[in-house]
Regions:
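Beta/alpha (TIM)-barrel catalytic core signal, keyed to glycine-rich beta->alpha loops juxtaposed to Asp/Glu
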Residues: 1-160
Length: 160
């Protein structure tokens, strides 16, 4: 970056300790950190640190890969019914209103179109608070600090 050849970097799965170490040790502030982020895993501590350094959170698996019954969740369903929207659309709108980038996955054309159809409603403060209360404070998909998870992500088979 100092040579001017790189204008910005992004990182993935950098937890608070790793992110702060990168910033303080290398004087590099990433533009984005792609992390597991959905109503059940809101990464509040990490997002607070990211906000201090103006790092944009990018939510991979914004639908928690379908876990915890997210598409049938009573809170998300009730909020969606108020606006004529699906639970998935409520999640995407929550992310948008929280200034988080969402990268939802779908292979179904109808759902892809629905994912874009979130600009015609705004979640109320009460709606946002209800979603905030869904946070479990832990990952559902990846245990990023676990050594076997790190090896798996690098294609290395963990042997005991």
């Amino acid at each position: 970056m100092k040579a001017g050849k790189v204008k910005a970097i992004g990182v993935c799965n950098f937890l608070p300790d790793r992110l702060l170490d990168l910033i303080l040790s290398h004087e590099i502030v990433p533009a984005v950190n792609q992390i597991e982020l959905h109503p059940f895993c809101q990464q509040k501590e990490l997002r607070k640190l990211m906000a201090q350094y103006q790092i944009q959170p990018m939510a991979w698996a914004p639908f928690a890969e379908g876990q915890n019954g997210i598409f049938q969740n009573p809170t998300l369903t009730a909020i969606g019914q108020e606006y004529g929207k699906t639970p998935a659309q409520v999640v995407l709108r929550w992310l948008m209103q929280s200034n988080m980038i969402a990268i939802p996955k779908s292979v179904h054309e109808e759902r892809i179109c629905q994912n874009f159809d979130i600009s015609d409603f705004t979640l109320s403060i009460s709606d946002m608070e209800q979603i905030e209360h869904m946070d479990t404070g832990k990952s559902l998909i990846l245990d990023v600090p676990a050594l076997d998870e790190v090896q798996r992500l690098h294609g290395i088979r963990f042997v005991q």
